[in-house]
């Protein structure tokens, strides 16, 4: 996993990974206590987080690195996946299989993979049926609810694009 790779590379560079927190841990007061009362040089954030959390971390750490898909409008080092290129590769494959009516299940707002989905379908001259776009949180529950929404509408689609594994 990405977290394991970061841990290995840190070790190679003579750094020690002292703590690992999930998004659930960040809301816990004990986590804030650990952050504020222990000397730690830096933090690596994997995946989405809001600017207030980044600002908080920047206050307590000399180095903050964000790793994710959507770029942040912030002055932090960022390691980004080219989500447009990834989406293009996936949709090119789906299109090569003959699919022309492709539904979407996932987040829409500030989501580069959704923007790529729209643009790639338009560039291929395909009509986008707005009813076949299910704006749901990208999670297993979101994917489940999005699939139910599509099935209840009895739409004519032959493929579904989900931006991540959990949603799929």
Model-derived features: positions:
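Active-site-adjacent beta->alpha loops and helix N-cap segments on the catalytic face
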Residues: 51-59
């Amino acid at each position: 996993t990405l977290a394991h790779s970061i841990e290995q590379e840190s070790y190679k560079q003579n750094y020690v990974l002292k703590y690992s927190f999930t998004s659930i841990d960040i809301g816990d007061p004990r986590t804030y206590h650990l952050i504020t009362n222990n000397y730690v040089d830096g933090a690596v954030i994997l995946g989405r987080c809001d600017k207030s959390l980044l600002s908080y971390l920047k206050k307590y750490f000399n180095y903050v690195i964000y790793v994710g898909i959507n770029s942040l409008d912030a002055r932090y080092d960022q390691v980004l996946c080219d989500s447009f290129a990834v989406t293009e590769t996936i949709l090119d494959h789906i299109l090569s299989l003959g699919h022309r009516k492709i539904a979407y299940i996932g987040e829409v707002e500030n989501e580069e993979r959704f923007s790529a989905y729209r643009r790639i379908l338009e560039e291929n001259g395909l009509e986008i049926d707005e009813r076949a776009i299910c704006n749901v949180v990208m999670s297993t529950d979101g994917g489940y609810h999005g699939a139910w929404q599509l099935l209840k509408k009895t739409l004519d689609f032959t493929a579904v694009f989900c931006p991540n594994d959990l949603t799929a």
